[in-house]
């Protein structure tokens, strides 16, 4: 079972009950629409008690296997806007398997919202026989646009399951996912999974380079309104505007959340023999903090749940990155991990005090997402209030931030006895090409144990530099910090790492 099936086929929520209720309108008619309407609906929804979902389906769809569900395919020739030859097309996901919740979808054109009707003959069902004349509804949708070439509509984004969505860019494959909101992620009380329950898809103009999606979110603790402006390209960009209306105080709200997978890599090798040297959708967390400091934290597959917190004020950006881009370091012809996108979240406006959180969960299989990252405000999001945030998501091979400093591109760890470790860090970047080699030095600190044998030297095999050091007498989890300097001036980002025996 795929990890995204596990994570996204979760909480299913009821259809919108607020009045006016566009989902309850005559489905052959249209209603007036403006973007503020979604906020009004979310605010009204939050003022009412939460209602548990009704996700009932006929047995033929409720009990599907993963492979059987995959046979439920939307017919591409029936795609929304295909006949109009517009720059975007939309195909829909059928309900079934883990995706039992119905989402209501509207098309918006000329200020009017028209319900997109479910028609069974829009799908091919394989061996699954749907009940005749049933309005079974949709589980989600995917967006297609010319990405690789002008005469073919590639899949560029998908919204399916809970509040999950993902995207790709030119030359890449799906990898990590984003979410509309996370609640209590990593908390002992258990996580709550909000759900996008209604979508409004704005019809793009001929020649448009972007598409707008509005969404209504609901869960036990909060309702919310979202506006996504989606621009596919060499980097696929989502401009996200969200307004949250909590029913209760949200102590642990995760903003701009993202989830990924890290099974093993050079810093955290596989426990059992594997023909691949690395298996991961992301290999590190990058942070550009409010003080202008650039941080890099390689990911791990820990023995126990790990939660890391990077306190900040008005962060400039953070994201789960896939820096290793060489097939030779993965050797997986099927998964092609070197083609998985990175995801960078760029806050816009004042996000005040809080922390970038990193959650690392033990896993034995690559089919499970075990990495999560998000921004958690220091102050709770209070009930009965309106909390507005704007940010930009960049899906692509790299971050959009300047590359003035050298970057750590590989972290290797070797055992030296029971409690000692050798760390070997490789760096790359144009900044290293102009340094005075005699003045280059590594600065390494640890909150426990002892740092020995710090060596900084050119790495001609990769056109960069290498920093190595020993961590000695370390018997407890150790927080490490390293930076490469030319004299007293940093020429690299800051490398952070938690070593656990």
UniProtKB/Swiss-Prot annotation:
Listed GO biological process terms: beta-glucan biosynthetic process
Source organism phylogeny: Bacteria, Pseudomonadati, Pseudomonadota, Alphaproteobacteria, Hyphomicrobiales
Its job: Involved in the biosynthesis of osmoregulated periplasmic glucans (OPGs).
Family: Belongs to the OpgD/OpgG family.
Protein name: Glucans biosynthesis protein G
Annotated localization: Periplasm
Alphabetized GO MF terms: carbohydrate binding; catalytic activity
Keywords: Periplasm, Signal
Pfam families: MdoG
Gene: opgG
GO CC terms of this entry: outer membrane-bounded periplasmic space
């Amino acid at each position: 079972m795929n990890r995204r099936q596990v994570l996204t086929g979760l909480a299913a929520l009821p259809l919108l009950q607020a009045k006016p209720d566009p989902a309850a309108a005559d489905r052959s008619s249209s209603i007036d629409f403006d973007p503020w309407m979604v906020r009004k609906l979310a605010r009204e929804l939050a003022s009412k008690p939460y209602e548990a979902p009704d996700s009932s389906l006929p047995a033929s769809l409720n009990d599907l296997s993963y492979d059987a569900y995959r046979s439920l395919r939307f017919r591409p020739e029936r795609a929304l806007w295909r006949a109009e030859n517009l720059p975007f097309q939309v195909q829909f996901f059928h309900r079934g398997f883990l995706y039992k919740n119905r989402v209501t979808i509207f098309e918006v054109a000329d200020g009017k919202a028209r319900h997109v009707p479910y028609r069974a003959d829009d799908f091919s069902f394989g061996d699954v026989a749907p009940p005749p004349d049933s309005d079974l509804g949709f589980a989600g949708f995917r967006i297609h646009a010319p990405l690789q070439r002008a005469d073919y509509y590639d899949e560029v984004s998908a919204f399916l399951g809970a509040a999950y969505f993902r995207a790709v860019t030119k030359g890449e494959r799906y990898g990590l996912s984003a979410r509309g909101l996370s609640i209590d992620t990593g908390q002992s009380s258990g996580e709550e999974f909000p759900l996008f329950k209604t979508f409004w898809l704005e019809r793009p103009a001929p020649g448009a380079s972007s598409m707008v999606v509005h969404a209504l979110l609901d869960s036990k603790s909060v309702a919310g309104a979202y506006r996504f402006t989606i621009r596919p390209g060499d980097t696929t960009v989502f401009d996200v505007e969200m307004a949250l209306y909590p029913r209760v105080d949200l102590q642990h709200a995760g903003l701009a959340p993202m989830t990924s997978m890290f099974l093993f890599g050079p810093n955290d090798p596989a426990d059992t023999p594997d023909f691949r040297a690395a298996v991961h959708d992301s290999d590190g967390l990058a942070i550009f903090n409010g003080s202008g400091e650039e941080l890099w934290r390689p990911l791990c597959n820990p023995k126990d749940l790990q939660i890391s917190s990077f306190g900040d004020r008005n962060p400039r950006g953070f994201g789960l990155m896939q820096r290793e881009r060489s097939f030779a370091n993965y050797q997986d012809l099927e998964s092609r991990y070197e083609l998985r996108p990175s995801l960078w979240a760029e806050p816009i406006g004042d996000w005040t005090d809080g922390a970038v959180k990193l959650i690392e969960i033990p896993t034995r299989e690559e089919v499970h997402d075990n990495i999560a990252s998000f921004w958690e405000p220091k102050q709770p999001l209070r009930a009965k209030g309106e909390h507005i945030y704007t940010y930009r998501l960049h899906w692509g091979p790299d971050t959009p931030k300047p590359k003035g400093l050298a970057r750590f591109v590989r972290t290797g760890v070797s055992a030296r006895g029971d409690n000692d470790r050798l760390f070997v860090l490789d760096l790359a970047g144009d900044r290293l090409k102009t340094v005075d080699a005699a003045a280059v030095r590594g600065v390494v600190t640890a909150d426990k144990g002892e740092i020995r044998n710090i060596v900084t030297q050119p790495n001609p095999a990769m056109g960069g530099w290498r920093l190595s050091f020993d961590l000695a007498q370390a018997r407890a989890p150790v927080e490490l910090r390293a930076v490469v300097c030319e004299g007293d001036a940093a020429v690299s980002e800051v490398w952070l790492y938690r070593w656990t025996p």
